C-alpha cells in the first residue's frame, strides 16, 4: 500500500528531470521549435530538436554532442558516420567547409520515436561563395537513456554537381576524422566557437 512517500524510482525520475538538459544548459540557439498542427513535443524532445538544428546550422559544441550516445550514427544520402569520432567530425567539419549556413525553415511532423522534421537549409561554400539550398527530412532516434542514437538526413532532391557537392563529398570522406579538428576540452571548444561567431558578425 502506498504511504504517500515518493518511491525511489519517482525520486530518481524527479532528480533526472531536474538535471535534464535545457536550451540554456546546452546553449541552444534554435529555441523556437515549429510544430505541425496536432504534433506536441515534450520539453526534452524540443531540446533534442533544437540542438540538432544548431548542428545543421554549423554551431556544434561539446555540450550539443553530450546529448548523443557515444555509439550513435549520423547518416545522409552519401555517408554513414558511426561512433563519436566520426559523427563529431561531421558536425565540426560543416562550418569548416560552409559559411554561412542558414536554416530557411523547419517543421516537426512527428513527435514519436523517431522524431521527424522537414528542413530547408542554405549552405554557402567557403571561399567559392557558391550557395545551395537543400530540403530534407530529418529523423532523430532516441535511445532508452534519452540520448540521440541516430540522426538520418534524407534529401528530397539529388545532390547537384558543382562546388557544393564537392565540398559535401569532402566532408563525407572517410578521411574526415583525421582532417577535422574536434575539441577535446570545454576551453578549446569555447575558443573555436568564439572564432566561428567572429566570422559571422
Which residues fall in each region the model found?
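Terminal "cap-and-tail" regions of soluble proteins that handle hydrophobic small molecules
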Residues: 2-58, 143-201
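A solvent-exposed, acidic/Ser-Thr-rich amphipathic alpha-helical stretch
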Residues: 62-115
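A short, structured loop/turn motif at beta-sheet edges
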Residues: 108-114, 141-149
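Generic short beta-strand segments
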Residues: 118-124
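Short, surface-exposed coil-to-beta transition loops
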Residues: 130-138
Amino acid at each position: 500500500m502506498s504511504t504517500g512517500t515518493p518511491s525511489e524510482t519517482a525520486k530518481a525520475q524527479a532528480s533526472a528531470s531536474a538535471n535534464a538538459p535545457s536550451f540554456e544548459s546546452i546553449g541552444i540557439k534554435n529555441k523556437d521549435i515549429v510544430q505541425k498542427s496536432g504534433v506536441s513535443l515534450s520539453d526534452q524532445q524540443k531540446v533534442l530538436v533544437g540542438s540538432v538544428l544548431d548542428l545543421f546550422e554549423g554551431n556544434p559544441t561539446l555540450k550539443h554532442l553530450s546529448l548523443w550516445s557515444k555509439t550513435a550514427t549520423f547518416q545522409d544520402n552519401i555517408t554513414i558516420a558511426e561512433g563519436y569520432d566520426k559523427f563529431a567530425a561531421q558536425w565540426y567539419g560543416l562550418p569548416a567547409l560552409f559559411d554561412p549556413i542558414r536554416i530557411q525553415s523547419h517543421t516537426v511532423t512527428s513527435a514519436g520515436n523517431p522524431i521527424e522534421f522537414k528542413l530547408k537549409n542554405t549552405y554557402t561554400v567557403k571561399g567559392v561563395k557558391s550557395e545551395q539550398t537543400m530540403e530534407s527530412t530529418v529523423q532523430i532516434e532516441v535511445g532508452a537513456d534519452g540520448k540521440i542514437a541516430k540522426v538520418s538526413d534524407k534529401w528530397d532532391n539529388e545532390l547537384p554537381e558543382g562546388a557544393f557537392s564537392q565540398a559535401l563529398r569532402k566532408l563525407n570522406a572517410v578521411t574526415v576524422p583525421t582532417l577535422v579538428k574536434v575539441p577535446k576540452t570545454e576551453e578549446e571548444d569555447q575558443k573555436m566557437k568564439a572564432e566561428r561567431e567572429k566570422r559571422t558578425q
